[in-house]
């Protein structure tokens, strides 16, 4: 069978880092992080994240687009200190969404719905009007929030805060930008918020809903001037609609006259319902989304491959990555999605030994927030490497120059599959996607015939035997506890798909035990009796009941 056609990749800057190295640079730390987010909808840490496009490069090189206008043309509209801040950041030309907002709104204080994709410069597009309105004579008293930005993830909140600090760097009066999201001490960060001067607050829905439950926090919003909902469709898609509606009931009412801005790539009914609360009738609708553009998941070449049993998927993934790298060895950058956080942790532990020639990263919900933030920054900056990830990055996160997305195991839904495919071929670049399944999971392409998924053109299954020895040696370096956690997560995840997998509970345990044998476990890892009961597997033969606590 012929090898897959070679891909023509855009020229990218070459850059450093050996195998398993770390990249330098982390996002700017905002002034406060208002702590631990309450339980969120079960979308494995729900969703999109920071705009990873190199915005500085985009704004400074837009001169190649004849319609792009320089920010300097807005000298009669924007305060000089804002223009100085943009210049200091290296932002010379407006992106299309910035140009739309800054030149087509009836006034910079007008309500609007703006359709724009992730990575197009939306952050600056909503920050400039909101901040300009404050500079025009609407600055709040010290300690009051004037601009509230609600976004779906902590990573995006950090990115917005970083750009905000850049835009406001040259203001004559310091303008603090605070953030509110989970992952740090609630008490200490809330104290920083209450003792500081949070003119701008960027928050995720769960954490913001939580802190607004306290009256002394609500009092900080009495001089609100602008409310921005960023990535509104992604936010509601992740299940945050109830929290967003509750937030809008707790802040001053729309009748107080604050400006509403809603940014969203699409406008489903749920977004329009929220927009009715945030916007006055007669709001302006702006869009930079081409209605005739082919969606990413339709234009990205997509393939699947399957192996007879689940234990062979580790060797199959190893063979696939090496085959893909052989086809495109320059700046090879890939994301491998696993089905569970503990499963992803196992993949990282395995392949840093099995594929030592590659620089590897991990990103999942079992990691601390500082570790996730650091990894996000490192993989964005990396010119090559493999990120093993769960769906903390499945929706909306934008890593530059990812040429390959691999999904290992059964996606939980067609929507999840599509969102993951969308992590490649960003910003007009090339990319492809491969789904790796074992025999029982191979129904997925058949029941999704509308998706352009084709058989992988190289017989990867035939290459499995030559990879198995290396996989066995690599697993000898993986801690037994990591294997046990991945085994238990495998059981729990696949228990929800028994009907689709056409497995009984006994057969599921048999498959899971094949999975554990492939990890080098002499017997199935121990599982607590209570955990087995919660999984609905009480009395199923083949399980090894006991405690792993020492």
UniProtKB/Swiss-Prot annotation:
**Catalyses which reaction(s):** ATP + H2O = ADP + phosphate + H(+)
Q: Where is this motif: DEAD box?
A: 230-233
Task: Enumerate the Gene3D superfamilies for this protein.
Answer: P-loop containing nucleotide triphosphate hydrolases
Domain Helicase C-terminal stretches: 316-472
Identify the SUPFAM superfamilies for this entry: P-loop containing nucleoside triphosphate hydrolases
Q: Where is the composition biased (Basic residues)?
A: 1-11
What are the protein's UniProt keywords? Answer: ATP-binding, Helicase, Hydrolase, Mitochondrion, mRNA processing, mRNA splicing, Nucleotide-binding, RNA-binding, Transit peptide, Translation regulation
Main localisation: mitochondrion
Give the enzyme's EC designation.
Answer: 3.6.4.13
Which GO BP terms, alphabetically? Answer: mRNA processing; regulation of translation; RNA splicing
Q: Where is the transit peptide?
A: 1-41
According to its UniProt record, this protein's enzyme class is hydrolase
Instruction: Place the motif Q motif on the sequence.
Output: 71-99
- CDD domains, from UniProt? DEADc_MSS116, SF2_C_DEAD
- Where are the residues of the annotated region Disordered? 1-51
| Amino-acid positions noted as binding ATP in the UniProt annotation, renumbered to this chain | 116-123
User: What are this entry's molecular-function GO terms?
Assistant: ATP binding; ATP hydrolysis activity; RNA binding; RNA helicase activity
Homology family: Belongs to the DEAD box helicase family. DDX18/HAS1 subfamily.
What does the record give as the function of this protein?
A: ATP-dependent RNA helicase required for mitochondrial splicing of group I and II introns. Also required for efficient mitochondrial translation.
Its name, as the record gives it, is ATP-dependent RNA helicase MSS116, mitochondrial
User: Which organism encodes this protein?
Assistant: Phaeosphaeria nodorum (strain SN15 / ATCC MYA-4574 / FGSC 10173)
């Amino acid at each position: 069978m012929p090898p897959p056609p070679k891909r023509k990749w855009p020229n990218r800057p070459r850059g450093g880092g050996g195998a398993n190295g770390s990249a330098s640079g982390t996002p700017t730390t905002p002034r406060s992080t208002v702590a631990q987010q309450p339980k969120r909808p079960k979308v494995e840490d729900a969703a999109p994240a920071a705009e990873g496009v190199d915005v500085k490069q985009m704004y400074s090189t837009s001169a190649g687009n004849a319609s792009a206008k320089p920010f300097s043309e807005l000298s009669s509209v924007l305060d000089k200190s804002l223009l100085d801040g943009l210049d200091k950041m290296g932002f010379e030309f407006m992106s299309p969404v910035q140009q739309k907002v800054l030149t087509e709104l009836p006034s910079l204080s007008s309500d609007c719905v703006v359709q724009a994709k992730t990575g197009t410069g939306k952050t600056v597009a909503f920050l400039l009007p909101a901040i300009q309105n404050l500079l025009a004579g609407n600055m709040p008293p010290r300690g009051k929030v004037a601009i509230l930005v609600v976004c779906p993830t902590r990573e995006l909140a950090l990115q917005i805060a970083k750009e905000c600090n850049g835009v406001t760097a040259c203001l004559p009066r310091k303008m603090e930008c605070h953030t509110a999201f989970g992952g740090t001490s609630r008490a200490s960060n809330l104290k920083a918020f209450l003792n500081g001067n949070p003119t701008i607050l960027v928050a995720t829905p769960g954490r913001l809903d939580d802190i607004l439950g306290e009256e002394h926090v609500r009092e900080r919003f009495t001089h609100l001037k602008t409310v921005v909902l960023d990535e509104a469709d992604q936010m509601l898609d992740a299940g945050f609609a109830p929290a967003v509606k509750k937030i809008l009931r707790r802040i001053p009412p729309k009748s107080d006259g604050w400006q509403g801005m809603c940014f969203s790539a699409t406008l489903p009914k749920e977004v329009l319902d929220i927009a009715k609360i945030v916007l006055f009738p007669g709001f302006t609708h702006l869009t930079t989304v081409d209605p005739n553009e082919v969606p990413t998941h339709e234009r990205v070449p997509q393939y699947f491959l399957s192996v007879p049993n689940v234990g062979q998927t580790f060797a199959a993934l190893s063979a696939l990555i090496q085959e893909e790298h052989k086809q495109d060895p320059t700046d090879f950058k890939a994301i491998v999605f696993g089905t569970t956080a503990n499963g992803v942790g196992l993949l990282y532990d395995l392949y840093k030994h099995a594929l030592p020639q590659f620089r590897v990263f991990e990103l999942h919900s079992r990691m601390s927030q500082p570790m996730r933030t650091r990894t996000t920054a490192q993989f964005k900056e990396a010119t090559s490497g493999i990120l093993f990830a769960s769906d903390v990055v499945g929706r909306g996160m934008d890593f530059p120059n990812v040429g390959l997305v691999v999904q290992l195991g059964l996606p939980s839904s067609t929507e999840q599959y599509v969102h993951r495919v969308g992590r490649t071929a960003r910003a007009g670049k090339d990319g492809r996607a491969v789904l790796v399944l074992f025999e029982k999971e191979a129904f997925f392409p058949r029941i999704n015939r509308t998706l352009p998924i084709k058989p992988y053109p190289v017989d990867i299954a035939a290459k499995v035997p030559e990879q198995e020895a290396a996989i066995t040696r690599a697993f000898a370096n993986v801690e037994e506890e990591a294997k046990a956690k991945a085994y238990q997560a495998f059981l729990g995840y696949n228990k929800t798909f028994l009907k689709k997998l056409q497995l009984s509970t006994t057969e599921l345990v048999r498959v899971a035990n094949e999975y554990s044998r492939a990890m080098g476990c002499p017997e199935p890892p121990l599982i607590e009796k209570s955990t087995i009961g919660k999984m609905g597997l009480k009395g199923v033969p083949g399980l090894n009941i006991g405690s792993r606590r020492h």
